[in-house]
């Protein structure tokens, strides 16, 4: 019975989500977004059926629908895997997309082609559902590329803006670099394992050295989840509309790389190299992104860098061989990250598209509900006890402090945790507190549509961590006893960050405006000089190409081209003229020579 209900619910979800996509364009003035977010709402209610059955029976189900390709040595089947990861994530993604689409009906109300915008968001969601429910790598790759192309279309939605076009191209290019690793893994498994089925890969991989495909998977996750070296596209992605940023950063594209490593983690847990790379890469990413967020003044860019920092923390959990903790943090992070972006969008919309936090302030009086939800989201991000982020973040840090694996990675992660509290409190202080520093606008009225939507996500940011912690079965026995200083390490560094953030925010108002920023400020504001380094290589390539073209055009081309021929003819003519050889014998000799050459050419080509 369960084997029938699971695929039927997935088919029903896709059918409901496809209805707004197949519906022809409506020219009426009615709210076209109602059908989109209502379809997602119904799909979310349907997804609760397999989630309830999964929590009740606690068993995985693999359903094969039909065979795509069948040869003597290689088969590709369309199959779906219904386990705790896929069923839980599908419900969370539908819930968050429902809230985001409802928010978009208010945020994008005055924009043309908003109906197409809702369809793009639905396709974005459907691609992610295909990715998380796939049971073979080829099917997973379809969802992988689906979220990639939809992110390109949505980030560049305002195609009249140069920054949006640049950001969309940047996202595609960096993700193509990550796709090289995925394709390398697909090719290796096709050559040596003769299968892309995930269950068969787990069985067959025990007899092979899986270092090469593991490195390929890490490269793929580095590109898609914006880890260090392939990260610059993620802060730029906030050039898209706020609903796009909320969906992309919370429950779709950026977590696809982490989910790929979670899904294929059994082939990595016995290898020492791959988890070590994940651990060090995640620690470096989380500290780097937190450092960059300290000096940013764009409200959306601060939230974007916090996403990159939390993705690094998820990568650390995978490096600790704790993929269930990484998935736990994906689920809790999705709620408060979507809420933070929607709160930021509501504030920007209310302040006439102002995004600089230095020009805000006093929103606690003008936007009390939005400000309260923003504060809850930031507290959940910091890991405040008993909010959603605390349960997952504290579990990862406890596993880190008791792992005895890498003191360097532990130190970087704890520093990044402290920096998270610093930039979170700085944002709350500059946006919500104090007196307004923006221009005087019309009376700001909090619309019930965005506040109700954000309130729904706020409840998730409060209780989701507790609920998921009771339903998730850990893959390893958790640490039950530890020294008190290790138990309190996460809370202590967070409190230290709050104190430091308060001190920095108060001192910033006393600093002379003419003070020249130092190297640490430029180091942070310029994203650790990565844009400079990434531009340096293309600039050198263009310069070398220009130099080569100039040399060829002005030297070799003219030497053997028009200038060379003209110089040769002039030399011959001058020689004939100077030596007075202009006689009938000379003319006859030249004439006969020309005829002989012509006959030889005709003989050669006939």
Swiss-Prot record:
Belongs to the complex I subunit 5 family. One of its GO terms (molecular function) is NADH dehydrogenase (ubiquinone) activity. The chain crosses the membrane at residues 2-22, 36-56, 89-109, 115-135, 140-160, 178-198, 212-234, 242-262, 273-293, 302-322, 328-348, 371-391, 405-425, 462-482, 488-508, 519-539, 556-576, 582-602. The lineage of its organism: Eukaryota, Metazoa, Chordata, Craniata, Vertebrata. GO terms for biological process: electron transport coupled proton transport; mitochondrial electron transport, NADH to ubiquinone; mitochondrial respiratory chain complex I assembly. Its EC number is 7.1.1.2. Pfam families: NADH5_C, Proton_antipo_M, Proton_antipo_N. The keyword Transport applies. It is an enzyme of class 7 (translocase). It is a multi-pass membrane protein. It is found in: Mitochondrion inner membrane. Keywords: Electron transport, Membrane, Mitochondrion, Mitochondrion inner membrane, NAD, Respiratory chain, Translocase, Transmembrane, Transmembrane helix, Transport, Ubiquinone. InterPro entries: NADH_DH_su5_C, NADHpl_OxRdtase_5_subgr, ND/Mrp_TM, NU5C-like, Proton_antipo_N. It catalyses: a ubiquinone + NADH + 5 H(+)(in) = a ubiquinol + NAD(+) + 4 H(+)(out). Signal peptide: none annotated. This is NADH-ubiquinone oxidoreductase chain 5. Core subunit of the mitochondrial membrane respiratory chain NADH dehydrogenase (Complex I) which catalyzes electron transfer from NADH through the respiratory chain, using ubiquinone as an electron acceptor. Essential for the catalytic activity and assembly of complex I. One of its GO terms (cellular component) is respiratory chain complex I. Core subunit of respiratory chain NADH dehydrogenase (Complex I) which is composed of 45 different subunits.
């Amino acid at each position: 019975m369960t084997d029938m209900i699971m695929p039927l619910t997935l088919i029903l979800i896709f059918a409901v989500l496809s209805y707004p996509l197949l519906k022809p364009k409506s020219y009426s003035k009615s709210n076209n977004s109602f059908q989109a977010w209502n379809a997602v709402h119904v799909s979310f209610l349907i997804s609760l059926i397999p989630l309830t059955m999964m929590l009740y029976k606690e068993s995985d189900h693999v359903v094969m629908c039909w065979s795509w390709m069948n040869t003597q040595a290689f088969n590709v089947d369309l199959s779906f895997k219904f386990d705790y990861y896929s069923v839980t994530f599908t419900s969370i993604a539908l819930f968050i997309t429902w809230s985001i689409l409802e928010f978009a009906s208010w945020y994008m109300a005055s924009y043309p082609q908003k109906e197409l915008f809702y369809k793009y968001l639905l396709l974005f969601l459907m691609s992610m559902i295909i990715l998380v429910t796939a049971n073979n790598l080829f099917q997973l790759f379809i969802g992988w590329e689906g979220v990639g192309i939809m992110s390109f279309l949505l980030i560049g939605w305002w195609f009249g803006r140069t920054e949006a076009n640049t950001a969309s191209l940047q996202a595609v290019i960096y993700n193509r670099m990550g796709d090289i690793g995925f394709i390398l893994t697909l090719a290796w498994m096709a050559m040596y394992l003769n299968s892309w089925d995930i269950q068969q890969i787990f069985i067959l991989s025990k007899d092979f050295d899986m270092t090469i495909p593991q490195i390929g998977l890490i490269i793929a996750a580095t590109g898609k989840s914006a880890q260090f070296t392939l990260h610059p596209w993620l802060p730029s992605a906030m050039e898209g509309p706020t609903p796009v940023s909320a969906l992309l950063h919370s429950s779709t594209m950026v977590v696809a790389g982490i989910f790929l490593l979670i899904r294929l983690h059994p082939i990595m847990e016995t290898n020492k190299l791959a988890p070590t790379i994940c651990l060090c890469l995640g620690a470096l990413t989380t500290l780097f992104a937190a450092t960059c967020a300290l000096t940013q003044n764009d409200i959306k860019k601060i939230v974007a860098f916090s996403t990159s920092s939390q993705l690094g923390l998820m990568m650390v959990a995978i490096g600790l061989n704790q993929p269930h903790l990484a998935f736990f943090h994906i689920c809790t992070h999705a709620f408060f990250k979507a809420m933070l972006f929607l709160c930021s969008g509501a504030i920007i919309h209310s302040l006439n598209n102002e995004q600089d936090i230095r020009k805000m302030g006093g929103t606690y009086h003008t936007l009390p509900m939005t400000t309260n939800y923003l504060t809850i989201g930031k507290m959940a991000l910091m890991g405040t006890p008993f909010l959603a982020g605390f349960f997952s973040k504290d579990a990862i840090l406890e596993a880190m402090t008791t792992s005895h694996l890498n003191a360097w990675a532990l130190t970087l992660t704890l520093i990044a945790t402290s920096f998270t509290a610093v930039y979170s409190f700085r944002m709350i202080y500059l946006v919500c507190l104090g007196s307004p520093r923006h221009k005087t606008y019309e009376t700001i009225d909090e619309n019930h549509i965005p506040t109700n939507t954000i309130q729904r996500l706020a409840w998730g940011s409060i209780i989701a961590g507790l609920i998921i912690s009771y339903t998730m079965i850990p893959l390893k026995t958790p640490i039950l006893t530890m020294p008190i200083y290790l138990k309190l390490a996460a809370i202590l560094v967070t409190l230290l960050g709050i104190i430091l953030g308060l001190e920095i925010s108060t001192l910033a108002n006393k600093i002379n405006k003419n003070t020249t920023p130092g190297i640490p400020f430029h180091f942070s504001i310029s994203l650790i000089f990565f844009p400079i380094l990434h531009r340096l290589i293309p600039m050198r390539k263009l310069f070398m190409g220009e130099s080569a073209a100039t040399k060829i055009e002005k030297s070799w081309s003219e030497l053997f081209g028009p200038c060379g021929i003209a110089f040769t003819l002039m030399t011959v003519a001058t020689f004939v003229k100077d030596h007075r050889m202009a006689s009938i014998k000379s003319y006859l000799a030249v004439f006969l020579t020309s005829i002989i050459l012509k006959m030889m050419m005709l003989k050669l080509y006939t």
